[in-house]
Amino acid sequence: MLSDINISRKHVCKPIAEIATNLGIVESELSVHGANKAKISLSVTNRLASKPDAKLVIVTAVTPTPYGEGKTVTTVGLTQAMNAIGVKTCACIRQPSMGPVFGIKGGAAGGGYAQVVPMEELNLHLTGDIHAVSSAHNLAAAAIDARLFHETRLGAIAFTKESGLNAVNIDPENILWRRVVDHNERSLRQIEVGFGAVNGPVHSSGFDITKASELMAILALSRDVKDLRQRVGRLVLALDLVGKPITAEDIGVAGAMTVIMRDAIEPTLMQTLSGDPCFIHAGPFANIAHGNSSIIADSIASKLADVVVTEAGFGSDMGFEKFSNIKVRESGYKPSAAVVVVTLRALKANSGIESEVAIDQPDMARLEAGFANLQWHINNVHQYGAPVVVAINRFPTDTSAELDWLQAKVATTNAFGCAISDAFANGAQGAAELAKVVHAATMVESEFNCLYETTDTLESKLMTLAEVGYGAASVSLSDKAKLQLAWLHKQGYSELPVCIAKTPMSISHDPNVKGVPRNFELPINELRLNAGAGFITALVGKVMTMPGLGIKPGYLNIDIDADDEIIGLA
């Protein structure tokens, strides 16, 4: 079988204007960027405001493993197959970060014959949204440091007299806004800035990867430009000398930041190998942010299609939980069905059993032990109220006996249905059975619900997520987190939803604990306010907001060949 990039390159894409027209987008709503992608105006939703919303399908997965579960493959393959059986369907996915592309994970266009094309355009730059987020974010960092410099240099009274602005009295020990770059760069995690006689004061800072920026979460959760502008204005950049928040509005940078992001608020339209529409927009990580594509992309797609298929990052304890308790709460757009992706390899890897048998070889002992992880994720998704469909993403080495066993086991759970998907190898045809089961699930009456009310106390929300969301026995707060909790209450932020930042490699906070962890204590190390995005992030265990490159990063394989073609992109 050809590599993903060769499959993409051999494919002849339809003109993107044709994809848009077939979807129902008119010419005035289309801004073409080259031959294969286009920005779509938010005016679509106004034109089609009276049209009922499409059914929404959310794709999640079991606890992730190094082998890959194929969530994007399933999202794209399901979209292809739904259209093939006559159900007008559009996909909505996140924009990939170049950090993982050049690191270890690779791109995020799907794979095989279930991918968004051209994959190299999707994985590298796209229409520049991530760069816009980086620029807007770093403008705020420059603005807060410049304000600190001038207020310190002149003093509050002279500063106000010379500038006409009120002094905000920034505490240099409490500058919360770091910088961002869209690469994995561990050496920038902790830095000191302001050295030199005319560059200070010196203070601690650091870099996060752009997808960890609160601006990325804001982009994903905003409804329109007005909402974006208001959210940017609420960003807390620092604290003043008496511990009160200083916002982007306070230092006058919110308007300029919004201007930089004005075009980024429009989703980008591309196509699958079958010529099906796919919106790509925003890209917050699911382990450190809320891990879902934008509300705007969903809302536009919901007026143009009959079914919208989107995905949430990592396992159901991560992106799906945040989809349910943060994104749905903001958008009001509830799913009609949820798909849990699983592979035989994932069950074996999540079994917690060490074995000399290769992961792609039959091993019933590990399969049986690992099934508990799938059972947990089915139950986890089911408690939110949407019908659950299990998609078994098939690999070439999977045996019929193993697949039959797994289907029989799923039949004993409270899943609505189960189907094997071979979309990677066979595109729409490979996901035909899955499409039928998912379509049937969307026809079932269901009542979707969140796990908690925002009016619950912060302590109660943390406890609910720990116990009901992860199966923890208790929660512990560090001394730092306790002080932050009291501050959040005092400043009036206690009614915001909670976003747990933790490892995706286990349901618990410990990546080494596989299967279904039980009776553990969830350690909350830090609470971070995201006033613009509208949630409080609780850092659990060891969480990095800036990845590092491994010993053999992906960029070693990437180059330009003699024909000026990109090679080695995965």
Swiss-Prot record:
It comes from Shewanella piezotolerans (strain WP3 / JCM 13877). The keyword Nucleus does not apply. The lineage of its organism: Bacteria, Pseudomonadati, Pseudomonadota, Gammaproteobacteria, Alteromonadales. Its EC number is 6.3.4.3. The gene is fhs. ATP binds at residues 65-72. The keyword Ligase applies. InterPro entries: Formate_THF_ligase, Formate_THF_ligase_CS, P-loop_NTPase. Keywords: ATP-binding, Ligase, Nucleotide-binding, One-carbon metabolism. HAMAP family: FTHFS. PROSITE patterns: FTHFS_1, FTHFS_2. GO terms for molecular function: ATP binding; formate-tetrahydrofolate ligase activity. Pathway: One-carbon metabolism; tetrahydrofolate interconversion. One of its GO terms (biological process) is tetrahydrofolate interconversion. This is Formate--tetrahydrofolate ligase. Coiled coil: none annotated. It catalyses: (6S)-5,6,7,8-tetrahydrofolate + formate + ATP = (6R)-10-formyltetrahydrofolate + ADP + phosphate. Gene3D superfamilies: Domain 2, N(10)-formyltetrahydrofolate synthetase, Formyltetrahydrofolate synthetase, domain 3, P-loop containing nucleotide triphosphate hydrolases. Belongs to the formate--tetrahydrofolate ligase family. It comes from the Bacteria.
